[in-house]
Amino acid sequence: VDSIEEVLKKCGIRDGMTLSFHHHFREGDYVVNMVMEAIHKMGIKDLTICASSLGKAQNPIVPMIEDGTITNIQSSGVRGKIGEAISNGKLKGLAIMRGHGGRVRAIETGETHIDIAFIGAPSADDMGNCRAIGSQNGADCGVLGYAAVDAQYADKVVVVTDTLVPFPNVPASIDMTNVDYVVKVDAIGDPT
């Protein structure tokens, strides 16, 4: 798929969905902001963000909390301006904090249902086999294990990468049987 906007349409993005993201790029992450900016431009509202963690890198989504694009957050922690916005009552719905194991349990039991999972991957082939290493831009992250449960249980799984490699990209951290779409972007994160 050629763009975030195109993959959102293919996944049937609509109001009220739950979207998942991961924090393996820590404060260098570009994926959350990139996806949420595209969604915001489409006018989609009332979303639940189920992220393994949210930090200062995601501060640009605060206006989306304030305008109702994002109404619920599930995470292991929130820092920076997102934490301040939640503490100041700007989130219209619930903020649910769980440890990483609690997040996995909630997804496996169906307590949390993910409509679309976005997995930032340093490298992927066009079939979706992705790895935590191999980024042309140096944005390797070590592991994609946090995202495995999302890939297994989400209705749609989108791998976002800045490095497409020849098939097969093995050994894959997440294999193509659990991926619906691959989107190549200019950069998934800042390795510094």
Predicted ranges, named:
Residues 1-192:
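Conserved alpha/beta enzyme-core scaffold
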